[in-house]
Design a protein with these regions (language model features):
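Internal gly/pro-rich beta-alpha loop/helix module
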Residues: 125-236
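Beta-strand->loop->alpha-helix junctions that form or flank phosphate-binding loops
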Residues: 37-38, 172-180, 269-277
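A short, charged/proline- and glycine-enriched loop
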Residues: 1-2, 237-243
């Protein structure tokens, strides 16, 4: 089985572009590839999914123990001929930027994957060899198996490749030229989502054509051939006992594939709906999940869907088990200011008006602790979370305690009760008791309302 992790010395080196190009090329070759993303990012897996037509999973060693990550990887890779992981940030950049925990290197080390390092030879030549030698020797083993040059000309590749191989001992496996017609734009939370990019499939085809031509495929495939991961025996997915409505559209698109799998494994049927277009919730539901996304970019349309807002407010106030993260939390507030500064009424379930803070707010990983029992949490428990948002609310809640793993910054956040969780923190549900608790609350609600 072909298996590797793509990493880079720093963010902005072209990991996502290179990952998509290689995935498309592997797909064309009949390798039936699957994809994974190191870390908590929601957007890069959307591009993987756009290339492959199958879900991409997140693998995060802050969220999950190594054995859980290995199981998630093996589960996702089962039935595929190639597995490609995309790293995050710089190769060794982990918690707080001062640890290698949860870094791309940590994931490669945990899974035993060869690493292909994506580098841009911009303003460097021999110094690039020194940088690569440093990366290769910084941890033992580094797992670096080869180099891919990004935004590189054929002439530059011909000049650099022999020198880099001689100086570092690492094979240079090829290059991706600069393709202005295949550029993907970005905004305040990273790249545009895959659904928003015009002519995405044509751009992906151009990228795949380029790597087909400029990469030494026999060499790459030989370096990355490994035994398939062993999947532990998994319990059968139980028959669905309750329906959970999951918001999914352009405004609410930050959902992990593993979360939905965990809901199903807990006995729930996942039923999607669009807060932008549907005027009512799905019928006979026992729970409601409102994930994050970009509600601030669609505030007018969300606000004008008054029938759905009224129903959501009424159902939550009647006890419908609900979990709302980040953008979903903002949707339940009093009002949401859009990117142009216009304020729009929202569901009004919670206090608080949300506005653009003009910067990332409480960005990064944290541990979320409960002081009392509720639908999802038990007193004294702690769960890993992350926050990633520019908008902030005048009422973020105080029910839970959050603490960063590096630096120790602390704050209160969230609203909880026996049927409710809402707050800025994104939860990572897989491998925790949270899906079972949510599904149990949903079953109890349906039993009481049938």
């Amino acid at each position: 089985m072909i298996q590797f992790l793509l990493a880079a010395p720093r963010s902005g080196s072209g990991k996502t572009t290179m990952t998509c190009a290689l995935l498309m090329a592997l797909k064309r070759r009949g390798c039936a590839p699957c994809a994974f993303k190191n870390g908590p990012d929601y957007i890069d897996p959307m591009y993987h999914r756009a290339v492959l037509g199958v879900e991409s999973r997140n693998l995060d060693l802050f969220f999950s123990a190594p054995e859980t990550v290995r199981t998630l990887y093996a589960k996702g890779a089962a039935g595929h001929g190639a597995a490609v992981c995309e790293g995050a940030m710089g190769f060794y950049d982990g918690l707080g930027g001062v640890s290698d925990r949860a870094s791309a290197w940590h994931l490669a080390d945990t899974l035993g994957l060869p690493v292909l390092l994506v580098v841009e030879p911009k303003g460097q030549s021999l110094t690039l060899a020194a940088e690569l030698k440093g990366l290769d020797s910084f941890r033992t083993p580094s797992h670096i198996a080869g180099i891919l040059l990004n935004n590189c000309t054929a002439r530059m590749h011909a000049l650099l490749a022999p020198m880099l191989e001689e100086e570092t001992g690492l094979p240079v496996l090829g290059f991706l030229p600069k393709l202005p017609e295949a550029v993907i734009g970005s905004r305040h939370l990273g790249l545009y989502t895959a659904a928003e990019v015009e002519n995405l499939q044509q751009k992906l085809a151009l990228l795949a054509d380029a790597v087909e031509e400029h990469i030494d495929w026999p060499r790459l495939l030989a370096l990355c051939e490994k035994e398939p991961p062993v999947l532990p025996v998994q319990p059968e997915t139980p028959p669905a006992r309750v329906r959970i409505a999951v918001a999914q559209d352009e405004a609410f698109c930050f959902t992990y594939a593993e979360t939905l799998e965990a809901f199903r494994d807990a006995g729930a049927e996942v039923v999607f709906f669009s807060p932008l277009r549907d005027t009512a919730l799905p019928e006979n539901i026992g729970g409601l999940y409102l994930p994050g996304g970009y509600p601030e970019l669609h505030a007018k349309e969300l606000s004008e869907n008054t029938s759905l807002l009224r129903e959501i407010k009424q159902k939550i106030e009647s006890g419908l088990p609900t979990a709302a993260e980040c953008g979903g939390f903002l949707y339940l507030g009093q009002s949401l200011t859009d990117a142009e500064g216009q304020s729009w009424p929202m569901a009004g379930v919670l206090p608080g008006e949300a506005k653009d803070a003009g910067r990332l707010v409480r960005f990064g990983y944290a541990a979320l602790s409960a002081d009392s029992d509720s639908m999802l949490f038990r007193a004294g428990e702690s769960f890993p979370i992350h926050e990633f948002h520019h908008w902030d609310s005048t009422a973020n809640g105080v029910a839970l305690a959050a603490k960063k793993p590096v630096g120790g910054a602390e704050w209160r956040c969230g609203f909880i009760d026996e049927h409710f969780y809402a707050g800025f923190p994104h939860l990572y549900w897989a491998g925790t008791p949270l899906p079972q608790r949510f599904a149990a609350a949903a079953e109890n609600y349906r039993r009481d309302h049938d």
